[in-house]
Swiss-Prot record:
Protein name per Swiss-Prot or TrEMBL: Small ribosomal subunit protein uS4
Keywords: Ribonucleoprotein, Ribosomal protein, RNA-binding, rRNA-binding
Complexes and interactors: Part of the 30S ribosomal subunit. Contacts protein S5. The interaction surface between S4 and S5 is involved in control of translational fidelity.
GO cellular component terms given for this protein: small ribosomal subunit
Molecular-function GO terms, alphabetical: rRNA binding; structural constituent of ribosome
Keyword GTP-binding: no
Gene designation per UniProt: rpsD
InterPro entries: Ribosomal_uS4 (IPR022801), Ribosomal_uS4_bac-type (IPR005709), Ribosomal_uS4_CS (IPR018079), Ribosomal_uS4_N (IPR001912), S4_RNA-bd (IPR002942), S4_RNA-bd_sf (IPR036986)
Amino acid sequence: MSRYTGPRLKIIRRFGGLDLPGLTRKRPKNTNPPGMHGAERKKKSEYAIRLEEKQKVRFNYGLSERQMIRYMRKARRSKGSTGLALLQMLEMRLDCIVFRLGMAPTIPAARQLVSHGHIEVNGQKVTIPSYGCKVGDVITVKNKESSRKLVAAYAEYPGLFLPDYLEFDKEKLRGRIKELPPREQICAPVNELLVVEFYSRKL
């Protein structure tokens, strides 16, 4: 299953108007799922509930199913909570870090910045959105007028709160990762335990 590139508000409606900040900052006027008129909904099976949680993660972080499986396998090999390890790996992707720093309004916009060569990590240009950042990494904008103007305009966009595990100098357009993100500062409205349960029968 490839990464979703269709209408984003349609996905938000599918989840009853749930806020997925990585996908879009817009809000639909109608929060009923597409094709459903009125508020009546069928009771979901346990499988459907787990599937929905998995899909929330996929759409919020802009992942393909193949990428999800790869991250899940890595998370299962890590120490501690598999669910937390999964979310931390996703949050430490370069496109997500750029988004959390406020350099882009959404993860898709951050992904475009990275792939077009506007972002550097520790002084080196990185064009892979899935690049796994590490604690201590310094994320900056390429020292080019067009790059700095683009990110400066994005930085004026009313974004999410800057989490404590990051620091950002708005004048220099420079960010640094201070520590791994704790669960309470990961703005992903998902139940990661259900995501782990979903894949436990598949991997």
